[in-house]
């Protein structure tokens, strides 16, 4: 997605060979116009999948998930990382290790909002080692719902998360795929485009 790649190049900051900071538009301050375009792109890519619900994880996945849900006309349910006094019982639970925060979180979804009749699109802001996506897949599978695919805003293709998910037969659609963050520079994966004759 060209507009997203341009935003990453203009406003993202490479902090190391593994870490890209995009808090200027995605995971701290949010650019609503960009989020709207991201939502439209996810809806376009998954429109034939009969999505009934979008599942994401708090908090950075919420903005792109809501915009995609708006385009698809479905609801969003987000996995919580913290226990809530209002959500104590009747929860699906999974453990997720955060590479960025270097900690394991217990994530949960209420059983009241997802069931075996749902066809789910999972959306998240980043895909690196795949732990968040695998945790969300576990929650969806515990509910007996089917997974239509995973939409990722930014994939670090040099890490193994995307490979792990695709090897499980899951459709993964990433809007920006980063090949490298070496030497403080963002390099995107170049996809071959077929020539139309």
Swiss-Prot record:
Residues noted as binding xanthine in the record, renumbered to the chain: 20, 27, 156
Catalytic activity, as annotated:
XMP + diphosphate = xanthine + 5-phospho-alpha-D-ribose 1-diphosphate
- Write the gene name: xpt
**Which residues hold 5-phospho-alpha-D-ribose 1-diphosphate?**
128-132
Question: Does the keyword field hold Cytoplasm?
Answer: yes
Naming one, the record's GO cellular component terms include:
cytoplasm
Its lineage opens with:
Bacteria, Bacillati, Bacillota, Bacilli, Bacillales
Annotated GO biological process: purine ribonucleoside salvage; xanthine metabolic process; XMP salvage
Q: Per the database entry, which stretches of residues form a coiled coil?
A: none
Q: Keyword annotations for this protein? A: Cytoplasm, Glycosyltransferase, Purine salvage, Transferase
Q: What is its main location?
A: cytoplasm
Q: Where in the cell is it found?
A: Cytoplasm
Give the record's subunit note.
Homodimer.
Broadest EC class assigned to this enzyme: transferase
* Endpoints of the signal sequence: none
Q: Which organism is it from?
A: Bacillus cereus (strain ATCC 10987 / NRS 248)
| UniProt xrefs under NCBIfam families | PRK09219.1, XPRTase
Mind telling me what this protein is named? Xanthine phosphoribosyltransferase
């Amino acid at each position: 997605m060209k507009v997203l790649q341009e935003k990453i190049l203009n406003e993202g900051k490479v902090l190391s060979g593994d870490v890209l900071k995009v808090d200027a538009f995605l995971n701290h301050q949010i650019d609503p116009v960009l989020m709207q375009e991201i939502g439209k792109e996810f809806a376009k890519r998954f429109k034939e999948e009969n999505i009934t619900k979008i599942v994401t994880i708090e908090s950075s996945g919420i903005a792109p998930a809501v915009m995609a849900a708006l385009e698809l006309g479905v609801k969003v349910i987000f996995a919580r990382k913290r226990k809530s006094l209002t959500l104590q019982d009747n929860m699906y639970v999974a453990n997720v290790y955060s590479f960025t925060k270097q900690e394991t979180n217990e994530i949960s979804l209420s059983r009241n909002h997802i069931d075996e009749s749902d066809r789910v699109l999972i959306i998240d802001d980043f895909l690196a080692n795949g732990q968040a996506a695998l945790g969300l897949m576990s929650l969806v599978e515990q509910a007996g719902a089917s997974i239509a695919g995973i939409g990722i805003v930014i994939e670090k293709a040099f890490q193994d998360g995307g490979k792990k998910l695709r090897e499980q037969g899951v459709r993964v659609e990433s809007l920006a795929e980063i090949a490298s963050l070496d030497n403080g520079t963002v390099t995107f994966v170049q996809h071959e485009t077929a020539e139309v004759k």
